[in-house]
């Protein structure tokens, strides 16, 4: 949810800047609605967008901004409808596919989310953000092999993006590929030093394959990084 709000913040900021030269009726309503969204007063924002849309029913931005606000308010069905309307007015608006896909995922409509992400990837097959989104949707839809393909391809494009290795490691655990997961978590440790849980997770994985000495080394590193949960694992397995 934090990621959705952050992305929406960027969109709304852009809209506010654009509106300086926007003379269409209802401009002030849209500014007020955007401001209410930024202040997380979603009920007020939606009411203002409603008024704006009545005045400007052919302006896709009213529906799109209302949709992102509905996403933050967890009104996913309404958001889906607004993003669909956005795309009927502006079929090439990439952000609407992003958000509609997210609304589908929240409603567990994974096939529809995958369809939206694939629509963008057909035009831009090297889009790492959309590869990550589709991989997540595939995974939620129990299509783990396809999710792995997307993550493999994304890593080939963005070799230094630690989050990709983390996602792939988590997927490999589901696929019972412990050795593969350990290799990816090793990359995570190098690329994401701020992720303190990596040594604790690696310790648990080493225990699964009966490599207790390696597990204990990882638990020690986790404790050095103030990962409190590693203390019990170390006591139970390493003393």
Where are the language model's segments positioned?
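Helix-start (N-cap) detector for alpha-helical repeat units in TPR-like alpha-solenoids
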Residues: 25-27, 60-61, 94-95, 128-129, ...
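Terminal, low-structured helical/coil segments at or just beyond the last alpha-helical repeat
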Residues: 26, 204, 208-239
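Register position in tetratricopeptide repeats
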Residues: 38-39, 72-73, 106-107, 136, ...
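Canonical tetratricopeptide repeat
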Residues: 65, 99, 133, 167, ...
């Amino acid at each position: 949810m934090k990621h959705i709000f952050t992305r929406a913040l960027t969109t709304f900021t852009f809209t506010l800047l654009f509106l300086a030269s926007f003379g269409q009726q209802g401009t002030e309503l849209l500014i007020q609605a955007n401001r209410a969204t930024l202040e997380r007063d979603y009920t007020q924002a939606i009411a203002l967008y409603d008024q704006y849309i009545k005045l400007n029913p052919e302006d896709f931005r009213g529906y799109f901004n209302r949709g992102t606000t509905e996403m933050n308010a967890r009104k996913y069905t309404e958001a889906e409808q607004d993003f669909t309307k956005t795309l009927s007015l502006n079929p090439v608006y990439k952000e609407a596919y992003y958000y509609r896909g997210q609304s589908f995922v929240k409603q567990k409509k994974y096939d529809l989310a995958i369809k939206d992400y694939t629509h963008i990837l057909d035009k831009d097959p090297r889009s790492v953000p959309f590869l990550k989104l589709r991989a997540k949707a595939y995974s939620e839809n129990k299509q783990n092999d396809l999710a792995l393909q997307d993550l493999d391809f994304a890593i080939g494009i963005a070799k230094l993006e630690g989050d990709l290795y983390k996602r792939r490691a988590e997927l490999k655990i589901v696929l019972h590929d412990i050795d593969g997961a350990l290799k990816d978590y090793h990359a995570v440790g190098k690329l994401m030093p701020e992720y303190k849980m990596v040594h604790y997770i690696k310790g648990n994985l080493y225990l699964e394959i009966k490599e207790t000495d390696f597990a204990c080394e990882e638990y020690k590193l986790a404790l050095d990084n103030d990962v409190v949960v590693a203390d019990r694992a170390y006591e139970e397995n390493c003393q």
